Amino acid sequence: MTVIAVIDYDMGNLHSACKGLENAGAQTVVSDRPEDLFAADAVVLPGVGAFDPAMQHLRSRQLVPVIHDLIASGKPFLGICLGLQILFEHSEEGQEPGLGILAGTVKRFDPEPGLTIPHMGWNQLDLTQPGLPLWQQLELRPWLYFVHSYYVEPADLEVQAATITHGSQTVTAAIARNNLVAVQFHPEKSADAGLQILANFVSQIKAPVLV
């Protein structure tokens, strides 16, 4: 059975992410031990909360270089919600530097009349990399579940894999580059479409992406 390591760094309840991956046919191991992360077939970086505490927790566990090495090794890697945002260089939300694996920043939604911030609830993805294996067997504009006040703004739009529109603002909702994929929505809370995405990720592990 495919083993997926879920990085434990005290940022959110990991149970729902693990349950979603297990429903997709994987075995999960929750750990912050580098040996467990490298031994797994793939790694998931989840996260709920604020940018600065997330980075502080990763640094306190000496996990920043480990995450860099995991991604550089070609191991399939999925970031979810805050796990997408901290892949970038910095955030308007705080002062801590991010992982810097992707160039760009994390920005807050601009206020608009009638616009709810945080963006909380269901929204439709527009797939900017429609051929991405992560999107297989999805509807053309699938509905996914979001809870966020901030969004990523990649310096290189070629990594953008999907967008959403909230009010008048169209922003990046997913990125993909080689073995690295990350999403702003919560697939584990997104009903059938979310479970399909997790199943697609598990399937990719069995057919690795060449870097």
Curated annotation (Swiss-Prot):
Pfam families: GATase. It is found in: Cytoplasm. It comes from the Bacteria. Keywords: Amino-acid biosynthesis, Cytoplasm, Glutamine amidotransferase, Histidine biosynthesis, Hydrolase, Lyase. One of its GO terms (biological process) is L-histidine biosynthetic process. GO terms for cellular component: cytoplasm. The keyword Ligase does not apply. InterPro entries: Class_I_gatase-like, GATASE, Imidazole-glycPsynth_HisH. Pathway: Amino-acid biosynthesis; L-histidine biosynthesis; L-histidine from 5-phospho-alpha-D-ribose 1-diphosphate: step 5/9. GO terms for molecular function: glutaminase activity; imidazoleglycerol-phosphate synthase activity; lyase activity. Heterodimer of HisH and HisF. This is Imidazole glycerol phosphate synthase subunit HisH. It comes from Cyanothece sp. (strain PCC 7425 / ATCC 29141). The gene is hisH.
